[in-house]
């Protein structure tokens, strides 16, 4: 059984037991606008399929350390591999706009993103069939959320770029079948997309030169998780790099 197949099985089990989400009480923010010309999306990520990253940093402490230099937050809500929780969303929302990251296969998860206060929701293109991915993205848009549609190759990126509505393409440096990361491959996809659609680059970025490269390719931002979880103060340097790049564009 490959990773994505196993993911779907665990999500189906979760959906069978999760309670309905609360009614939304937090304001809805335009996630794309919050990124400005180029944003740092700081992710709260306690673990990954490769193992535990950090358990001694509670969400409120992480967000308090990085919010000054981050444009938005990404929050993992998947509990099995990422030790995530929907309850982290409103904590993040107290500081910045929020992207909910999970393995979304059902509209109920989008309703949860909305109910707990997220402004954007991740939809992984390879996790579901094409028509299902489009349906989920459209449903998110109807609720006022920004769908961030995650891809890892040029062909899928070009396909998603033809979809209607307000969305962001998330170029993932990680191959979800092998879990291998290749940042240079993500940059190649970004070059093919430049000017066609709003996009961000995700996974595996940690160095200032990688952030500068993403900015020079006219990404709307970068999503950084592991590097900032291990060293939250890095966000200041990355923000400074981004601002210098924006000034040169």
UniProtKB/Swiss-Prot annotation:
Entry keywords, A to Z = Amino-acid biosynthesis, Aromatic amino acid biosynthesis, Decarboxylase, Lyase, Tryptophan biosynthesis
Q: Does the keyword Amino-acid biosynthesis apply?
A: yes
Cleaved signal peptide residues? none
EC number in record? 4.1.1.48
PROSITE patterns documented for this protein: IGPS
Q: Does the keyword Transmembrane helix apply?
A: no
Q: Which Pfam families match?
A: IGPS (PF00218)
Reaction(s) catalysed by this chain's protein: 1-(2-carboxyphenylamino)-1-deoxy-D-ribulose 5-phosphate + H(+) = (1S,2R)-1-C-(indol-3-yl)glycerol 3-phosphate + CO2 + H2O
Pathway entry = Amino-acid biosynthesis; L-tryptophan biosynthesis; L-tryptophan from chorismate: step 4/5
User: GO molecular function terms here?
Assistant: indole-3-glycerol-phosphate synthase activity; phosphoribosylanthranilate isomerase activity
Superkingdom per UniProt: Archaea
Q: Name one GO biological process term.
A: L-tryptophan biosynthetic process
Family, per the entry? Belongs to the TrpC family.
HAMAP family listed in its UniProt record: IGPS_A (MF_00134_A)
By what name is this protein known? Answer: Indole-3-glycerol phosphate synthase
Name the gene behind this protein: trpC
